[in-house]
Amino acid sequence: STGWVDPFTHFCDPGYEHRETLATGAAAAQAGGFTTVFVVPNTQPVIDNKSQVNYIVQQNHQLPIHVLPIGALSKKIEGKDLAEMIDMHQSGAVASSDGLYPVQSTLLFLKALQYVKTFDGVVIQMPIDKSLGSLGLMNEGITSTQLGLPGIPAIAEELMIARDIELLKYTNSKLHITGVSTAKGIALIEAGKKAGLALTCSVTPYHLYFNETDLNTYDTLLKVYPPLRTKADQAALLAAVENGVVDCISSHHQPQDWDGKTIEFEYAKAGIASIETSYATINQLLPQLNDEKIANLFSNNARQIFNLPSKSIQEGQSVELTFFNRQEVITKSKSYSKSKSANSPFWDKALKGKVIGTFSKGHLHLNTEA
């Protein structure tokens, strides 16, 4: 396949290098088969101006794969004033988003959608209305009641998706919704696409693999945001990947240190370091997808949506390739992880699908161990 692209990862650098650095994140991404990743701006300092974009662009020269910055949509990702989006675009930002902090202000989001049109940019939004279930720890429903945990209702996602689609219609801009977790959310996106909007979406491997009932042991490794939803939601997401409503897989790779996960569920940090097992998870769940569909989900669609070079094999062009085996069953152990953080429920799980290696920036890299 042409080199895989992950459009939503958190490499924690600068500011939180104890959890991940650009170098360790890039190594983990490469092990996972990715030759291009987008990093969210939720760093310290925030990627909200061209000098912060330049930091990532400069660091990228030393890395084995392409690590591209997503420029913040608002200053300091506070959701109040627009950041210098044009400056960041010109300096190399690949998209505009507040990353892990979805934009709550309708006016600001409207302005952002209008603003990116000047440079044919794309806004990425993780859809959660934070005023609903703001203290929630998991999906709101029977399971949350049984476990005695406060919930985040599905409607918090659905309202945000509905709002953002209406704003997209109004502005005729480009929007990518990532981390969709509900059946109704996916249905709204499908309707928006049928209406001809420049609307695309991605889901995470873990929303496809797990559901809320997996939380019955209070496993903090499964504390994620957006939360794991119902079995019916999970089935709807899997169907949407199969039928093409979902454009891409984004790992939402979010490293957390040991202290952030080995505490009570209520206080544990959200997120999974999922980039190394992203492909195997999808291949395990959806073996019926043909090779072309896998290539579209992991590479071609993202390249098209975000105006990246196609990197396919053409005379005189540089190529990016990912080599993968769909039949081999692998069991990744934590000790072989390239990431700085080991917060993943996928370690020691037998998953069908192996990344053999990548060809990126003129170098062939073969994965030597599981």
Say what each PLM segment does.
Residues 1-60:
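Metal-associated gating/positioning segment near the N- to mid-region
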Residues 6-9, 34-39, 66-68, 140-149:
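Gly-rich Lys/Arg/Thr-decorated short loops/hinges at beta-loop-alpha junctions or inter-strand turns
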Residues 8, 29, 33, 67, ...:
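Divalent metal-coordination and catalytic microenvironments
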Residues 18-26, 77-87, 163-164:
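Short, acidic/polar
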Residues 58-73:
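A glycine-rich helix N-cap at a beta->alpha junction
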Residues 83-249:
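Histidine/acidic residue-rich metal-binding segments in metalloenzymes
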Residues 146-172, 242-243, 247-249, 254-324:
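His/Asp/Glu-enriched, well-ordered alpha-helical/loop segment
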Residues 267, 318-370:
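C-terminal cap of metal-dependent C-N hydrolases
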